[in-house]
């Protein structure tokens, strides 16, 4: 039976002390996916966005998404400022991690490796910088498996000694709200997840 991670999040949020918000390191893939999540979670946490996405190719695309992540943080009204921790681009790390899985279908084994790569760096950074929780915006997407993401996150929480924030942000029309906010703030919405293997193909040729 599938876990209801939205209910788990609801239960966790109900226990948080209102007088002092805990610190959350939130891995984000892009501005659009983080829009609803930041609107939601900044009521309960002091949030730092971690932009760590070595899967995004090419580098120009990585920088473009980073720019719009910064713009969203600058424009979105939140109870208190949202910080941004942007990692240096390291596309080779992703290429090495998924070697041999290049032809896997979208949503398959390659994506599992990618999820773990990004979430493990988030857990590592969370421990290094003394965050109370770590989490990800990825569960807002209807194309991302919340069961898999949360299982990986919970495992890494045990390994790194930092609490995992369970989530399924697509619930309660979270994805719909992210589209509304993206339009409201004029955010760039990409047409593929990030790696070149997931890029749309037209007439046998990958889009430039």
Task: Show which residues each predicted segment covers.
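Nucleotide-activated chemistry modules centered on ATP-dependent adenylation/adenylyltransferase
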Residues: 1-208
């Amino acid at each position: 039976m599938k876990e209801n991670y939205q209910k788990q999040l609801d239960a966790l949020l109900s226990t948080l002390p209102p007088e002092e918000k805990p610190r959350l390191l939130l891995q984000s893939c892009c501005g659009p996916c983080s829009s609803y999540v930041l609107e939601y979670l900044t009521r309960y946490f002091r949030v730092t966005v971690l932009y760590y996405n070595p899967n995004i190719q090419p580098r120009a695309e990585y920088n473009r998404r980073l720019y719009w992540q910064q713009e969203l943080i600058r424009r979105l009204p939140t109870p208190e400022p949202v910080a941004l921790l942007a990692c240096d681009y390291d596309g080779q790390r992703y290429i090495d991690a998924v070697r041999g899985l290049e032809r896997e279908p979208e949503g398959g084994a390659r994506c599992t490796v990618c999820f773990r790569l990004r979430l493990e760096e988030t857990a590592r950074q969370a421990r290094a910088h003394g965050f109370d929780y770590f989490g990800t915006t990825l569960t807002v997407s209807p194309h991302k498996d919340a069961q898999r993401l949360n299982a990986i996150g919970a495992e890494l929480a045990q390994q790194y000694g930092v609490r995992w924030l369970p989530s399924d942000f697509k619930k309660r029309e979270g994805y719909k709200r992210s589209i509304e906010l993206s339009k409201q703030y004029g955010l760039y919405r990409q047409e593929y997840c990030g790696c070149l293997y997931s890029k749309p193909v037209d007439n046998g040729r990958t889009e430039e």
